[in-house]
Amino acid sequence: MKFTSLFFLALSPLAVRVLADTVAFDQTYDVGSNSLNIVSCSNGDNGLEVFGFTDFASLPGFPLIGAAGAIEGFNSVNCGTCWELTFVNSKGTSKSINILGIDHAGAGTFNIALEAMNTLTNIQAVQLGRVNVTSKQVAASVCGLNI
């Protein structure tokens, strides 16, 4: 028994962390002409403007963008991280999308573009409001960010 426990403890750093979180929409992220200057990941050493992005529409994968709890605030080292969000509907059908993190959200939450949430929930974002999801961080390149 002790050997089994030690084996799993040894493997735990290699495991991908899957978290239970919630997602809601914020239509601010649907407006392609919105400047990056209104989000936490604008400028600074970890900001997205240093890579030539200027507004939401210039970001790869727009409108699959939003705020993530992992982004602590302005100039976070987690700016530009990519998150796979998986929603399971009432019939047990799951759907996943990848979201580029560009702004701060509360711990355990994501706030994403309405269009992105409609993709995730089969056009039920407004009806559902906030939903439970599982999230896991994936390579930024999955969201089209190759920096």
Which residues make up each language-model segment?
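Classical eukaryotic N-terminal signal peptides for Sec-dependent ER targeting/secretion
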Residues: 1-11
